[in-house]
């Protein structure tokens, strides 16, 4: 056949030329596209490709699993289901064809050698049998010959006696008999020699065949041993039935087994006869003895149903996983022991417990280790810790901008000061001119960037100020020079000290005529804020937010303090921060203001924040501009959370949204458990107090606010208004507008609806009108708290006071058929009015309290009698009036109560 080129061959088999050249190279032939290819090379390439593509696994392992359920009795009379899985593994080995052929040839040679040796042995046995038969025949012939010779001798004796008479006959017969005996002896000798020659030939042939079989077996012994080493040992019960030695060995083994069985039988009988030792025997031993000795006539019933489990001779040490709390029964189940053993161990350790008692993790660890087990402690928040620790963080820490919180008393000019720094009008936008949110802003100055947090100064915003102090690096304490130190100023100092944050004092309103900065220094020194010129650590800067005086000095003081602190943060990696403020926007959903502490917060990150989680859908700065990332010390608004997070929660970027949801749900469940436990505890503690006290009025409130911090502050302030008689109960609170659900809740709980910087939608207004609910809107927290106080005051029980208006002395007593005893009196003090309450005093002791029924002056009924005049007084339902008694006239006055 004509040789073809590689290129034409590639076109013929429809494969790329480069691939065909590579295949030739793999087969050991170096070709190019223009080289020719012979038929032999084609066959070589085809064999190479078939060998490559035909490679199948030489070993195949199959695993079979069978699952079943087993009910195991547990403590408390219950049973638990145990899943049982039985696994079977089987391996199939595919041999190489050449190796398989060689093994087959060796196996064939071995079988032929065995068959030849078997045939030789059978022929040897047959020849031995023939030899024995020939020997027996020869022996029988010799015996017959001896018998014949004896008979002939007897005949000769008889013939000698008749010798005289038969001389002629004897001389003729004797030569004939000797000739016959000679011929028979020669024939027997020839036959014996022929048999001996045949026997020698058979033995020689048997020895030759046995020698040849032994030589072949020695030649194949090495190959058989190698093959037996590679092949799995399938059976050891192989023997040659025709081998004499094998039969003897097998008979000896059978005799040994039979002897051991008889020995066990005798021992079992002796054990059964010893009744005194039955207490020390186990149930399994008695069952075995009965199984061996039953069946009197040698017929033993099969013992397939007898359990073959043996009691462990040593304790099993387990890995016991213990949670934060565990009951004694659960601990016993984990260690696979009885609960009584655990209780005994605890008693030895000095702790008394019942089987259902809950023990802590440390006690359970001591008990388990005392019983010899290995303890693995498991924390319930293990998932939370794993999620928090699985983070990508950079290693290079860089300088970051300081976070500065401006704190101080209300109306001391905090926001105005920040407003001047930002050159905007923030204070005018706040309702009432007071700050009610935490404002987070970052400001670029000539000397660097500074992030400012503006906190409220009103007393209701304590928690918001505390959060501001915890998230900050430096506190700027604003004190008005004309007002001095006020309550919220002292509270701000306490927050700063608790957070261990340095304080820079800004003495504001320095341009006012009545400003007294030295008085401010003196008052602050009483609370541990000492100026540097007095040997302290705090910088004092005189500023004016209106005129702009001292603003640059204040910024320089802040940056100087930040330089001393050496503030650093890792800029790269997954971010974490703190929630400054959060609220619910009707169009955007939950919105959280987050101050980034370290790392970079990017759009699209998965954030875990307290009880909430979510992917960041959008990010905005404090001016409302869309941004995609934020570094350390930058405040941003993020959208995309599952709910409104609580202000002050830590915001952390995590990898997996599924794990973030699990951690958030775990935190919610934990919070719910703690809340229920706290409520249960308060119920138990207040049980007897609630039984003794009277009816308590409750003012139910549904509160809605624009941001989370304001809602929290108002809730705390309202609950502090509660008294022993009127309690404020906030049945619902939240962030966002007032919805139909809020109105329905208020109608069901007979509550008033308070909206702080929010409004009700159309559906909520319809419910409010239909149910005649009390809906009020507020924008200043002062007004809200004052009106709630008024509502609580109206719910207070009225207070009554008795006021003495007159005093009369009894001079004489007259009898009247209509009124009975009538006292003639002189009014000594005040005025006596008709139908008023009176008290009768004798020796300054009240002996009667009743009502003045009749009042007369002379014979005329009058309504009142004034001081220094005489009158007649008839006391209703009382006749024991004596001269000298004093009649005290009083009236009850209702006093209107208010909430302080």
Swiss-Prot record:
<dbReference type="InterPro" id="IPR005225">
    <property type="entry name" value="Small_GTP-bd"/>
</dbReference>
<dbReference type="InterPro" id="IPR004161">
    <property type="entry name" value="EFTu-like_2"/>
</dbReference>
<keyword id="KW-0648">Protein biosynthesis</keyword>
<dbReference type="InterPro" id="IPR009061">
    <property type="entry name" value="DNA-bd_dom_put_sf"/>
</dbReference>
<dbReference type="Pfam" id="PF03144">
    <property type="entry name" value="GTP_EFTU_D2"/>
</dbReference>
<dbReference type="InterPro" id="IPR044145">
    <property type="entry name" value="IF2_II"/>
</dbReference>
<feature type="region of interest" description="G4">
    <location>
        <begin position="508"/>
        <end position="511"/>
    </location>
</feature>
<dbReference type="Pfam" id="PF04760">
    <property type="entry name" value="IF2_N"/>
</dbReference>
<feature type="compositionally biased region" description="Basic and acidic residues">
    <location>
        <begin position="278"/>
        <end position="291"/>
    </location>
</feature>
<feature type="compositionally biased region" description="Polar residues">
    <location>
        <begin position="68"/>
        <end position="82"/>
    </location>
</feature>
<dbReference type="GO" id="GO:0005525">
    <property type="term" value="F:GTP binding"/>
</dbReference>
<dbReference type="InterPro" id="IPR006847">
    <property type="entry name" value="IF2_N"/>
</dbReference>
<keyword id="KW-0547">Nucleotide-binding</keyword>
<dbReference type="InterPro" id="IPR013575">
    <property type="entry name" value="IF2_assoc_dom_bac"/>
</dbReference>
<feature type="compositionally biased region" description="Polar residues">
    <location>
        <begin position="165"/>
        <end position="176"/>
    </location>
</feature>
<dbReference type="InterPro" id="IPR027417">
    <property type="entry name" value="P-loop_NTPase"/>
</dbReference>
<keyword id="KW-0963">Cytoplasm</keyword>
<comment type="function">
    <text>One of the essential components for the initiation of protein synthesis. Protects formylmethionyl-tRNA from spontaneous hydrolysis and promotes its binding to the 30S ribosomal subunits. Also involved in the hydrolysis of GTP during the formation of the 70S ribosomal complex.</text>
</comment>
<dbReference type="Pfam" id="PF08364">
    <property type="entry name" value="IF2_assoc"/>
</dbReference>
<dbReference type="GO" id="GO:0003743">
    <property type="term" value="F:translation initiation factor activity"/>
</dbReference>
<dbReference type="InterPro" id="IPR036925">
    <property type="entry name" value="TIF_IF2_dom3_sf"/>
</dbReference>
<dbReference type="Pfam" id="PF22042">
    <property type="entry name" value="EF-G_D2"/>
</dbReference>
<dbReference type="GO" id="GO:0003924">
    <property type="term" value="F:GTPase activity"/>
</dbReference>
<dbReference type="Pfam" id="PF00009">
    <property type="entry name" value="GTP_EFTU"/>
</dbReference>
<feature type="compositionally biased region" description="Basic and acidic residues">
    <location>
        <begin position="177"/>
        <end position="237"/>
    </location>
</feature>
<dbReference type="GO" id="GO:0005829">
    <property type="term" value="C:cytosol"/>
</dbReference>
<feature type="compositionally biased region" description="Basic and acidic residues">
    <location>
        <begin position="85"/>
        <end position="98"/>
    </location>
</feature>
<feature type="binding site">
    <location>
        <begin position="508"/>
        <end position="511"/>
    </location>
    <ligand>
        <name>GTP</name>
    </ligand>
</feature>
<feature type="region of interest" description="G5">
    <location>
        <begin position="544"/>
        <end position="546"/>
    </location>
</feature>
<dbReference type="InterPro" id="IPR053905">
    <property type="entry name" value="EF-G-like_DII"/>
</dbReference>
<feature type="region of interest" description="G1">
    <location>
        <begin position="408"/>
        <end position="415"/>
    </location>
</feature>
<dbReference type="InterPro" id="IPR009000">
    <property type="entry name" value="Transl_B-barrel_sf"/>
</dbReference>
<feature type="domain" description="tr-type G">
    <location>
        <begin position="399"/>
        <end position="568"/>
    </location>
</feature>
<dbReference type="InterPro" id="IPR000178">
    <property type="entry name" value="TF_IF2_bacterial-like"/>
</dbReference>
<feature type="binding site">
    <location>
        <begin position="454"/>
        <end position="458"/>
    </location>
    <ligand>
        <name>GTP</name>
    </ligand>
</feature>
<feature type="region of interest" description="G2">
    <location>
        <begin position="433"/>
        <end position="437"/>
    </location>
</feature>
<dbReference type="InterPro" id="IPR000795">
    <property type="entry name" value="T_Tr_GTP-bd_dom"/>
</dbReference>
<dbReference type="InterPro" id="IPR015760">
    <property type="entry name" value="TIF_IF2"/>
</dbReference>
<dbReference type="InterPro" id="IPR023115">
    <property type="entry name" value="TIF_IF2_dom3"/>
</dbReference>
<feature type="compositionally biased region" description="Basic residues">
    <location>
        <begin position="263"/>
        <end position="277"/>
    </location>
</feature>
<dbReference type="GO" id="GO:0097216">
    <property type="term" value="F:guanosine tetraphosphate binding"/>
</dbReference>
<dbReference type="Pfam" id="PF11987">
    <property type="entry name" value="IF-2"/>
</dbReference>
